[in-house]
From Swiss-Prot:
This is Phosphoglycerate kinase. Belongs to the phosphoglycerate kinase family. The keyword Nucleotide-binding applies. Gene3D superfamilies: Phosphoglycerate kinase, N-terminal domain (3.40.50.1260). Its EC number is 2.7.2.3. GO terms for cellular component: cytosol. The gene is pgk. ATP binds at K197, E314, G340, G341, D342, T343. It is an enzyme of class 2 (transferase). It comes from Sodalis glossinidius (strain morsitans). InterPro entries: Phosphoglycerate_kinase, Phosphoglycerate_kinase_CS, Phosphoglycerate_kinase_N, Phosphoglycerate_kinase_sf. Monomer. Pathway: Carbohydrate degradation; glycolysis; pyruvate from D-glyceraldehyde 3-phosphate: step 2/5. It catalyses: (2R)-3-phosphoglycerate + ATP = (2R)-3-phospho-glyceroyl phosphate + ADP.
């Protein structure tokens, strides 16, 4: 991957515009999971140490584009950064016509999605971003799959466009897992979005020795085996696709599950065979036999790619499956990569971050990279490196 690396540049006195992924969950004005900010911090700190005039921005949530909405403000991120850096951090709301930043100062530019044209990669907006800086640093792997004004367009017009350490390390780690993995390689694909992940399963079936499915995806495979899945989250129109994958790949479909009659934190979990599910029930977690089987598979793996929980781990009664899988990955000697927002939340919950070889900040970008798709931001950086 031929790109200009931020670590190869002298940033002293330069106006540096860093596009980070600071899209974190916020509740009552406080950041509730800081994994993405923590991952972005080394890039920010390195720029500050060099005496750069540092501007950092990100999107947060899904506000109506072009309209300010306090609910989606980056203020909670600013508060977090001030605390972590033990230094004042400014939040700039109106910055498109210029912002003054001192050497060694950090200014956070308000949510890029408050700017009209951000999502459409509007050229005029991209040029305004580019005019703010001497060096554009793309460090948001989590949004590298989106061609937007702050992730793609700005890089075309900035004097210098480079890859930040986080982005570069993400691409290297994923390359290591996908290009020449130590075997056996096990890929776990869970979560609720089935249709978006079936193409990923297809791609992974060609490189992984063993596929594992969980969550809503697993429910579709249970249905494909002819079982009633009741009110479970699944996609009926993808059953034939699931059958095709079952014929071509070794996928351990759950044989027992935890079900409930309502989707709530207080719902009672009932352990059942997949052949016994009633119309009124929904699958919210894997059963003990199914989970033990997965733990055994993971124990023998040499490379593990993990995207998505295997149950509704947010509810204590339906957490066991994801916890057993998470701890099996943590205890494994395999090179492990985990990615996706829900996966990061599970890693935080079980306190196993130090036992995962590499934690990717990307969700959609992680999946598109796994599928072998070209990420627009990376293509842009490669193009700029040739100029």
């Amino acid at each position: 991957m031929a790109v200009i690396k931020m670590t190869d540049l002298d940033l002293a006195g330069k106006r540096v515009f860093i596009r980070s992924d600071l899209n974190v969950p916020v509740k009552d004005g406080k950041v509730t999971s800081d994994a993405r900010i923590r991952a972005s911090l080394p890039t920010i700190e390195d720029s500050l140490k060099q005496g750069a005039r540092v501007m950092v921005t990100s999107h947060l949530g899904r506000p109506t584009e072009g309209e300010y909405n306090a609910e989606f403000s980056l203020q909670p991120v600013v508060d977090y950064l001030e605390n972590k850096l033990s230094a004042p951090v400014r939040l700039a709301k109106d910055y498109l016509d210029g912002v003054d930043v001192a050497e060694g100062e950090l200014v956070v530019l308000e949510n890029v999605r408050f700017n009209k044209g951000e999502k459409k990669d509007d050229e005029a907006l991209a040029k305004k971003y580019a005019a703010l800086c001497d060096v554009f640093v793309m460090d948001a792997f989590g949004t590298a799959h989106r061609a937007q004004a702050s992730t793609h367009g700005v890089g075309k017009f900035a004097a210098v466009a480079c890859a930040g350490p986080l982005l570069f390390n993400e691409l290297e780690a994923l390359g290591k897992a996908l290009d020449n993995p130590a075997r056996p390689m096990v890929a776990i694909v869970g979560g609720s979005k089935v249709s978006t992940k079936l193409t990923v399963l297809d791609s992974l079936s060609k490189i992984a020795d063993q596929l594992i499915v969980g969550g809503g995806i697993a429910n579709t495979f249970v249905a494909a085996q002819g079982h009633n899945v009741g009110k479970s989250l699944y996609e009926a129109d993808l059953i034939s696709e699931a059958k095709r994958l079952l014929e071509s790949s070794d996928i351990p479909v759950p044989t027992d599950v935890r079900v409930a009659t309502e989707f709530s934190e207080t719902a009672t979990a009932t352990l059942k065979s997949t052949s016994e599910i009633q119309d009124s029930e929904q699958i919210l977690d894997l059963g003990d036999v199914s989970v033990a089987r997965l733990a055994e598979i993971l124990k023998n793996a040499k490379t593990i790619l993990w995207n998505g929980p295997v149950g509704v781990f947010e509810f204590a009664n339906f957490r066991k499956g994801t916890e057993v899988v998470a701890r099996a990955i943590a205890d494994s000697e395999a090179f492990s990569i985990a990615g996706g927002g829900d996966t990061l939340a599970a890693i935080d919950l079980f306190g196993i971050a130090d036992q995962i070889s590499y934690i990717s900040t990307g969700g959609g970008a992680f999946l598109e990279f796994v599928e072998g798709k070209k990420l627009p931001a990376v293509v842009m950086l490669e193009e700029r490196a040739k100029q």
